[in-house]
Structure formats: C-alpha cells, structure tokens
Amino acid sequence: EEAWERYGSHPAFAGWYLTQEVGRLQWNIIEVFHELGKFCKELSGGLPTAISPYIEGIQLYDPFRTGVNAGKSVTLPDFEREWNEIMAGITGCVDSISFQDGGCDYSELEDFLSVACYAGKKHGILINTNVEAFDRDMPIRFLPIKWDKMLLKLRAAEKAGVAGATMFEFSHFMSPNSSYFQAHGLNRCYQHYLAGGFEK
C-alpha cells in the first residue's frame, strides 16, 4: 500500500514484482502468490504482476551446503507437474513468470523452459527467461558470465518459445561502468548481438 501511495501516480509504475523466489511447490506458495497478486491488482486497478522463480537444477547454489550442486535437482516431470499446479492456482493473479536460468545445466535449459511455456499457454500466463549474467561454474561467487555461455542460454530460451527476457544483474555483471573488467567485454558482445551479430 505504501509503495502504491507514494509511486502509483508515476507513469513508470507499470506493474508489480512479487519478490518471493521459490523453485518448487512448497511453503504454501500458491496461496502466497494468489493473495499477494490479487491484492496488488485490486489496489492498482489491475496492473500486471510478475514473479521470478528459479529452476532447482544441478547448478543451484545453496549457501547452506558445500559446493554448487545442492543435491536436490528437480526432474523434468516433477517440474512440469508442480508448475502446472502452481500456475493453475495463480491464474488471474500473476500475469508473467520469468524463470531464472542459472539453476539448471545448459543442456537442460531448453527442456525446462519449453515445459514452462507449454504450461503458461495452458493457464494464460506469459513465460519469460531471467538470464543470469554471472557464472556459476567458477570457484569464486560470482563473476560475470562468459559471452558464449550467455549466448547459449539466450538461444535455448528462444528455441523454447519464451515471450521475452529479463536479466539479473546488469549493474554488477554487464554494465560498461561495472568494477568487473569482464563486464565491459560482455556488454560489448551483447550490443553486437543485438545489432544482428553472431548469427542469431
């Protein structure tokens, strides 16, 4: 309510991001997304709502365990079943879902996003990818991702049929003003890609 009272009249206030990030059907998340999304829509006259869950795959970083692989990767059939159930329960309250792409292996990303897109069409929810611009394959947490890995993820998302892409996190990992030297090169490669380079 406070955010709406302060900023709701600004033209830049175009919708809501529900910040609860989950990867699976857990913690009464259907009720949380349903109630929060419904509240935000009613408060703002129907402005769109979005969530950005992660794919709980082999690359998922668990700060409470040693190593990157948390040892609890979701299978594709379980992902499909759980997200169908979640989407069925939040239809009309959540308009778009941007799946964080860093949790699963590159070879599995297209399959997970394809399943998500199919479920999204079934339930009337727009599916996007949330491209993580940092590298999970390095012993240091976290450095800007190599361009060829980002391109691989963008192409997998395109093949899966996502509606669009968002990114986490531009200012640290891809900005030409970032303190990470690697971010400057990543930004140049991405600009070249947008201009039609690298044979989209």
Where do the PLM segments sit?
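Glycan-processing catalytic domains of CAZymes
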Residues: 1-200
